[in-house]
């Protein structure tokens, strides 16, 4: 790792105190003369061709945004260091930076690929292609009534239902909005896609788990209602009547660096289930 870059969310570190501390520690630990620093808000416009490892300083939202922005152009691993709120996707919290540096120096880490989604939105007026690491959400506007959704999987009709919307999630996104809507946790290394309805007007419409290479087509009957499509809860577009939405596995995944002692279930307990450090499960 001769060329390390750091992407910082400036809203999380307005005085650069954390950034300067992290840069100093990495330079000392790896005997580096220079570390390139990038603003997470415009990182898509930057040249990261020579970066061997990208450190992301921020929260889950920062990492999600960078994963989407760099998906086409960046092939090196990403190490998330949480300086935000939840930090479920990050490999380490900023309070454990010294421990993380030792593990990096000793080579006690591995790379994991997390699948992403590709979303194509097509109408007579517009065509747009989006990507998501967590989820693609189709949902009605605040004052709209229920919408009728028709879902096809691999060209075969799966379901037609009325409700507030639906969530198409990756395993990484299974702990986010999908979980809040009643979807299951999916182990993040798997390649699966889930479809979870939002407030369906029938109890028979439940989450379905699909193979990772499934192709999902969604049509929404909403001539008089407002419908919005969002990716990772960050980018939203208004869906017009007669618009088709196609969601499938993205060709490229995102490569994350995690440490050898990473315990998914411990992170799940502490940051999602209990939101505490209780029940570490050292002994049963």
Curated annotation (Swiss-Prot):
One of its GO terms (biological process) is NADP biosynthetic process. It is an enzyme of class 2 (transferase). Its EC number is 2.7.1.23. NAD(+) binds at residues 60-61, 134-135, 145, 162, 164, 175-180, 234. It comes from Clostridium beijerinckii (strain ATCC 51743 / NCIMB 8052). The keyword NADP applies. Its cofactor is a divalent metal cation. The active site is at residue 60. GO terms for molecular function: ATP binding; metal ion binding; NAD binding; NAD+ kinase activity. It catalyses: NAD(+) + ATP = ADP + NADP(+) + H(+). Involved in the regulation of the intracellular balance of NAD and NADP, and is a key enzyme in the biosynthesis of NADP. Catalyzes specifically the phosphorylation on 2'-hydroxyl of the adenosine moiety of NAD to yield NADP. Belongs to the NAD kinase family. The keyword Lyase does not apply. InterPro entries: ATP-NAD_kinase_N, ATP-NAD_kinase_PpnK-typ_C, NAD/diacylglycerol_kinase_sf, NADK. GO terms for cellular component: cytoplasm. It comes from the Bacteria. This is NAD kinase. It is found in: Cytoplasm. The gene is nadK. Keywords: ATP-binding, Cytoplasm, Kinase, NAD, NADP, Nucleotide-binding, Transferase.
